[in-house]
Amino acid sequence: MTTLPAPTISTTAELRALLRLAGPVVVSQFAANALALIATAVIGRLGERELAAAAYANAAYYLVFIMVVGVMLSVAPRVAQAHGAGDARGVARALGGGLRLALLLSAVMLPLMWALSFVLPNFAPAGVSRDLVAAYLRVYSLGMLPNLAFIALRGTLEGTGKPGAVTGVALTGVVWALLVAPALAFGWGPLPRLGLAGAAGASASAAWIMAALLWPLARRRVAYAGPLGPLGDEVRALFRLGWPIGLTLGAEGGMFSVTTLLMARFGPEVLAAHNVTMQTITAFFMVPLGIASATGVRVGTEAGAGRLAQARRAGLVGLGLSSAVMLTFAVIELAAPRTVFSVFVNVNDPANAGLIAAATGFLSIAALFQLMDGLQVTANGALRGLQDTRVPLLVSLVAYWVVGLGLGSVLSSVAGLGARGLWFGLTAGLTLAGLSLVGRFLYRTRAGRAA
């Protein structure tokens, strides 16, 4: 019976290597989340009309944008495998191909977003300003190219084991948005009051600044490997690897979006409780998301170097770390739900008593939900390190849309569990995805198989 050679470094050493990568990535994830929070806070101060218009436009924009982001996530594993193999030319080609792919995707998506700005407002619900939706979408979409380029540059630094530079740049973007968003929205000093368009412009300009700052750092990290030649093959390879990632992210995001729409049937209080619970989970999810990115880099680096046993260990360490973190978060949430919810809502207001009660019930289900969510995102990251993306897509489609939404709808409507039934469905879908993807990773890294 064929066995894998022993891993080259211990589990403890692998954990240290993973933490060195994951720490800066997690901070960068929180910084990206902070940009969205800043925009929401500024728009909220502009008024209810502006907030509703931005929410409506973002719902359409991000449904498309998240899939394009998924395509760009192919850069990091390509870089990691080339870096692990000592292929400096491969690293440089992955970066060059990634930037060209960002340009091509933007050339397709920007006209689409511009056209959408004329069509989408016609379907806006009552009370949502069509003019504000159109203006926001046109200005906000100007940040698409730098955002995609930033992902390619970030993937290069992460893939070569130097994600720390990304943290400083991301925090710079947060500071910029913190200063510029209110200045443009409210017209500080000599600046004109641009309202919602100003807040959107601040977000777009932050993306351009971050991409510009990260470019020399990523370029310095890539050793000169001579003329790279035509990059068409590399762009195609990145797209082949990335499109299943994009559809996987779209499938997961779509499951949550449809669940939110179904939750609206149970009234505004239950819908608000659902949103508060999801906000809580999303905040904690930034940590396993960073661990997943770092795990993908570690697996890709070791697989590229031909060390399959070490790649397997890297993936298992990442899965263990992610599970431990999410289990800790679940204990905190179950022990002190009111404290957790106080970040998002006034828990002492008697008017919110029903909301808090419903959200606490959802959070009790979310304990397992979070554990499985951390497992699936980390397993997905490990499989991306092996450049395995098509089977995870099929798993995600079945887990999220057949089991997650299908079972949730049955439990909610037929079994009479109401809103909790939808949460049980989400948890079942994530459980199937998590366990299946872990099994896929173990299969891909077993003895006798090439990474």
Swiss-Prot record:
A Gene Ontology term for the protein's cellular component: plasma membrane
Gene Ontology MF annotations: antiporter activity; transmembrane transporter activity; xenobiotic transmembrane transporter activity
Record InterPro entries: MATE_fam (IPR002528), MATE_MdtK (IPR050222), MdtK-like (IPR048279)
Compartment(s) of residence: Cell membrane
Keyword Transmembrane helix: yes
Alphabetic keyword roster: Antiport, Cell membrane, Ion transport, Membrane, Transmembrane, Transmembrane helix, Transport
Source organism, top-level taxon: Bacteria
Transmembrane segments: 23-43, 53-73, 101-121, 132-152, 169-189, 194-214, 243-263, 277-297, 316-336, 355-375, 391-411, 422-442
Biological process annotations from GO: monoatomic ion transport
Membrane topology: Multi-pass membrane protein
Cysteines paired by S-S bonds: none
Main location: membrane
PANTHER family attached to this UniProt entry: FMN_FAD EXPORTER YEEO-RELATED, MULTIDRUG RESISTANCE PROTEIN NORM-RELATED
Family membership: Belongs to the multi antimicrobial extrusion (MATE) (TC 2.A.66.1) family.
Function: Multidrug efflux pump.
Name of this protein: Probable multidrug resistance protein NorM
Species, as recorded: Deinococcus radiodurans (strain ATCC 13939 / DSM 20539 / JCM 16871 / CCUG 27074 / LMG 4051 / NBRC 15346 / NCIMB 9279 / VKM B-1422 / R1)
Organism phylogeny: Bacteria, Thermotogati, Deinococcota, Deinococci, Deinococcales
Gene designation per UniProt: norM
